[in-house]
Structure formats: C-alpha cells, structure tokens
Amino acid sequence: MEKPRGTEEAPSSEPMEEEEEDDLDLFGGYDSFRSYNSSAGSESSSYLEESSEAENEDREAGELPTSPLHLFSSANNRSLDGSGSEPAVCEMCGIVGTREAFFSKTKRFCSVSCSRSYSSNSKKASILARLQGKPPTKKAKVLHKAAWSAKIGAFLHAQGTGQLADGTPTGQDALVLGFDWGKFLKDHSYKAAPVSCFKHVPLYDQWEDVMKGMKVEVLNSDAVLPSRVYWIATVIQAAGYRVLLRYEGFENDASHDFWCNLGTVDVHPIGWCAINSKILVPPRTIHAKFTDWKSYLMKRLVGSRTLPADFHIKMVESMKYPFRQGMRLEVVDKTQVSRTRMAVVDTVIGGRLRLLYEDGDSDDDFWCHMWSPLIHPVGWSRRVGHGIKMSDRRCDMSHHPTFRKIYCDAVPYLFKKVRAVYTEGGWFEEGMKLEAIDPLNLGSICVATICKVLLDGYLMICVDGGPSTDGSDWFCYHASSHAIFPATFCQKNDIELTPPKGYETQPFAWETYLEKTKSKAAPARLFNMDCPNHGFKVGMKLEAVDLMEPRLICVATVKRVVHRLLSIHFDGWDNEYDQWVDCESPDIYPVGWCELTGYQLQPPVSAEPNTPQKGKDTTKKKKKQFGKKRKRIPSAKTRPLRQGSKKPLLEDNLEALGVSEPVPDDIIAVCVKEEHQDISSLDRSPSPQLPLPIESIKQERNN
C-alpha cells in the first residue's frame, strides 16, 4: 500500500504486546490516559514513568520531535533578555525560567516543592530498583515525573470533565454541550477552511496528507461484540479536523456515512490493528454481503493511501505548550486598554491562556492565545515606555491554587516575536493620521492618530473623535501590525471607513480632513502590506473567538477577504457583531479544533430566540446590543458584562437596560498577529447570505 513519506516504519515507542482492555492502545505508542487525573494512583505513576522513559529514549534516537521546552536546555548559555540571565528547566516539572529565580544553589528546580518531590521519588525509585535486583544507577529515576505527551494526550482525548473556574465547560462536558459540525456542513453544503490555513494549530503543515479517498482503520460502531473491534473506512470528505467516513463494503451507499475527528483515539492508519493484535470485523449491516472479505479488502487497499504511522504521536507533540500554570506576565488591562497589568497563567487549553490579574478578584480573568500581541514578558512595559498599572494593593490570593503555584516570570522566548524595524530614513511621528481597526469595535476601521511613538517599533494610537480626553482609550499596535493601514486603504478596497465622531462632511475625504486638521498622513511605505497565499475564501466555515467575550469560541463564516484581512461573521448573529481579523490571527481555528482540545464551541442561534426571558425585556432593541452575546453561556456566577460592537463603555446605561448586578466593563483590545512576507492575490467576492438553522442556546451546567 502506498503511504505518505515518513510512514514506512512505526515508531519504536509503540508497544507490541496485547493489552487486556481494547481502549488502552492510544496514539500508536501511548497507553491509556484514563488515570491521568488521579496523580496519586500507583498505576498512573507507573505509566507516567514508563512513558517518560520511552519518550526520552526515542527523542535521543531522533524519532520524536523535540518539544519547545527541550530547546531551552540546549541554549542555556544564551541570555534571556540581554540582562545576562540564563534559562533553566526544572528537572521535576519541566517548567522554563531563569536560573536566578530557581530554587537551591544548583538551580535544578523551580521551587522547594519540586526539589522535595524529586528527592522523595528518587529514593523510592532506588529502593524499588534494589528490591527488583537491579544495580543502582548514578542518575535516579523519578517515579512521578509526568511525560508531556501523557498530560497533553490525556487532555487531547478529553478524559477530564468539569468546568473551569469561570464556568467554561471542558473535556467531555464541553463535547456533550457541543455542536454537530458534520450535520451542519452536510445539510447546507458548506465548505470548511482547510487546516493548512491556520499556522497556529496542530499539524497544520502536514494536513495535505489527509485527502479524499484515503483509507483508515476506525472503531466499528455497528458490531455487537464484547470487545472493541475495528473496520476499514474511506475518507469521503474532509472539513477541518473532521472527516466524513464510509465503511468499506457500503460502496456507493451513503446511508451509513459518519463524521469523525481525526485527532480522536479511534482512527488509525492501515496496519495499526495488525501491529496491535486488534480484530477487523465488518459492520453487522453488511456482514453477509461478501463471503471472502479478505480478498475484497486486498483489492480495495491496493494503491490507496493512509495516515502516517506517527500521525497521532505528532499530533500530541504539536500540542505541547510551553506556558504553564503559575507563570507571570504582562497583559493589556481590559478595563483601560492604554495600559497593562500583571497577570498569572491559570489555565492552558490548546494554546489559549486564561490569565488572572494579580491585583484583581479570583475570577477577574482574561483569555487570549499564547501568540497574542496583548501579552508580554515582565518588564516589557518599562522597556518600551508603555503604561502599566502599578498597585500597592494586592488581593489575598493565598486560597487560590494558581497563585499558590507561582513559579517564575515567563521568559521572553515564549512570546511571539515581532518584526524588527528600522527607523532610518523617516519613521512614524506623533500626530500622523492613518486607518486602524478599532479595538473596542472590531468590526470598524476608523480614522486614527498616532499619539505616541514607543521603543521597539510600538505605537500608541487613538481613534479620532473618541470620548476620552485623558488618553485612556489609546491602544498599542506594533508598526508591523496588519491592523493599521495607510490613508485611503478603505477607499481603495471598498471598505466602509468610520469617520471621526461629529465629522459632518459626507462622504469622508482624506484630503479635506488632513487640510482641516492641519495634519499629515503616515507614509504608505511604513506599513507592512505583505500578503501570503493564505487560502481563505468567502463562505468558508471556521471556529472564531468572540474578541469582545474572548472565552467564547463560536461557529463563524468568512464573510469577506481583502488581501490578508478577513471579515468574520458569527453565524446566527447580526452583522453588527462582525469582526475584522488578520488571516494569521491566533483567534480563528479550523472546524473541529474545539472538539480536539475539549473546549466548548458556541453553536449558531437565531437572531430572535423564542425564549420567555425575551418577553420580559422592555427595551428589546438595546438589550440585544448589550446582552445578546452574553446569553451564549450564562455563567454560574455574576460575570463582567461584555458589550456589543457600538458602545463599549456605557456602564451608566446598564441599570436602564434592566441588567441585574452590573460590574465594571471588560474591554478586549486589538486582534493582531505577527506577519510573514508572502504574496497573494486579492479576493473581494461578495459575501453570500447563508441560511441558518434555528438552534437552541447551549447553557453551562452549574457545579
């Protein structure tokens, strides 16, 4: 059988012996992760030890990709930020930090807890080795040192259940409340954006191996047997991480087709069952269709393609994220976007970080991706001249598990790098005019002014005609950002430009405005207008973060493509909630990403849900603007209310709208990402009006 390159041999870490239970053999080399959550269990500990050993041996042999964390250990002579600090990796938990912040003279551990755990487990391992008659070794083995692949693998398969502290369902709870992409795509003949369009997701650069017609071994759900059995299926259609499969033997009969996520445990390359002594059994519906199934399969498999043998291992490796719970960093202040605040990483899901503000309450959080331009290493604000909130008051967080586990500051290498800038020959100046995406209304591109030029290419920008006079609505963009544009960009690309508030001359003309304000436009040569061949097309479906409520990921559609700029429409919501994002934004994901990571996906809803609560609203029109998106996940607790797209700072009007127990508004700022120099053509086809089914709003379960 023909296979993609690099699939000739199975990884050496794959166990060959037969398991007692059929669900133990996951990822072609990683055992069951069911007991991952019970770290005190001896069975889990034994597995973690064995997995860590096998993983290390394979990595030394060059068979497994090196994780981001291991890259630091080989660069321990490099300075982190030019201050002479050296990176260090904790030998117990694998966290990355600076040597000066680590515990003990040897700087081998990030905390006294890790040091004691390592010492205790080393002694246990030594005693166990002697009892087994093994000679003592110089390098002690740590019994409870969990392999990264085990942890991420456990999360990848959503073995855990429950909710985060902010009420967001995860794991199986999220999948139960989830959304059926397969039915949605098939019923309306929608097309999903390919995984290869998203450079921040697992295996984006290898998804070309997944194609129509390829064969896989998949769990047979149409069998009445005491154990799990498998059968061969053909990929009929690929939609993001999800594929439409048809069991071999049904031929042209599509009545039993089913959707499956390729990142799940039950899909394997051809040959996996033979290697792992699993049984291939045809579905009960067609069991009597052929008498010689072996000959039939041989004919069907000749010349076909399958998944790489290490597909799931690479999937797990690509989901190793260097950020860990307890790392400190600087993040934009959601209540005042012109400054940053200190925060601590609380949760990492699929590269998305839930951050807790150090000077806030235990539920004062902020969600963003680890590649977001809104987060920075500690000291960034002071270095570039950006404002930061300094508070003498620090809330008592001793009871909070995240703040009890603060290890160290996140090192600069963990953050997305920005493009180097050269200011010779003219640079941005204060007072220059330009066009920019409004971070408080991401569906609008506005006339803006450079208010301050910071170091390292950063700019403080404000929207002309804004309500603030003290600079509290300024926001920071890097000069290479694709969220800022030269004057006349909107005019040239037929995009509606939002004029300054109070500007009466219609239509807006840049020449007239510059003359009236006695200002000049920023030179077009200073903007980064590179456009890669991103592959997005109008009408493609994806999963997108609602940046005004960034803990929500919703079903969305690419409404318009302008060079590398995408207009994202949230299915079921009004156009006023549309958002402009860059084609390489880390806040958009392929179909099936939420299912892959165990995150809850918000389904489309009707524009006017028929619910009893709606009948109680006296000002329905305004209520829709402020409270509509919040109804996607009613929180178990009183949550800060995120506004709609038009008026993000109207706290005084909340009582008039009938909102109970209002709290300070949460403002989510810029949606930008680092760029690469490529060339692509302009796609400006109009957006179709897509029919949307009426779906019920999914609600969180209270713990």
UniProtKB/Swiss-Prot annotation:
Gene3D superfamilies: 2.30.30.140, 3.30.60.160. A zinc finger (FCS-type) spans 81-116. Its main location: nucleus. One of its GO terms (biological process) is ectoderm development. Zn(2+) binds at residues 90, 93, 110, 114. GO terms for molecular function: histone binding; histone H4K20me2 reader activity; promoter-specific chromatin binding; zinc ion binding. CDD domains: MBT_dSfmbt-like_rpt4, MBT_L3MBTL2_rpt1, MBT_L3MBTL2_rpt2. Ubiquitous. Keywords: Chromatin regulator, Isopeptide bond, Metal-binding, Nucleus, Phosphoprotein, Repeat, Transcription, Transcription regulation, Ubl conjugation, Zinc, Zinc-finger. Residues 73-82 have a biased composition (Polar residues). MBT repeats lie at residues 179-283, 291-391, 397-500, 508-604. There is a cross-link at residue 698 (Glycyl lysine isopeptide (Lys-Gly) (interchain with G-Cter in SUMO1)). The modification Phosphoserine is found at residues 13, 67, 338, 681, 685, 687. Residues 35-49 have a biased composition (Low complexity). Residues 619-634 have a biased composition (Basic residues). Residues 1-85, 604-649, 675-703 are annotated as: Disordered. The keyword Lyase does not apply. Residues 15-25, 50-60 have a biased composition (Acidic residues). Phosphorylated. There is a cross-link at residues 405, 647, 673, 698 (Glycyl lysine isopeptide (Lys-Gly) (interchain with G-Cter in SUMO2)). It is found in: Nucleus. The keyword Amino-acid biosynthesis does not apply. InterPro entries: Mbt, MBT_L3MBTL2_rpt1, MBT_L3MBTL2_rpt2, PcG_chromatin_remod_factors, Znf_FCS, Znf_FCS_sf. Putative Polycomb group (PcG) protein. PcG proteins maintain the transcriptionally repressive state of genes, probably via a modification of chromatin, rendering it heritably changed in its expressibility. Its association with a chromatin-remodeling complex suggests that it may contribute to prevent expression of genes that trigger the cell into mitosis. Binds to monomethylated and dimethylated 'Lys-20' on histone H4. Binds histone H3 peptides that are monomethylated or dimethylated on 'Lys-4', 'Lys-9' or 'Lys-27'. Part of the E2F6.com-1 complex in G0 phase composed of E2F6, MGA, MAX, TFDP1, CBX3, BAT8, EUHMTASE1, RING1, RNF2, MBLR, BAT8 and YAF2. This is Lethal(3)malignant brain tumor-like protein 2. It comes from Mus musculus (Mouse).
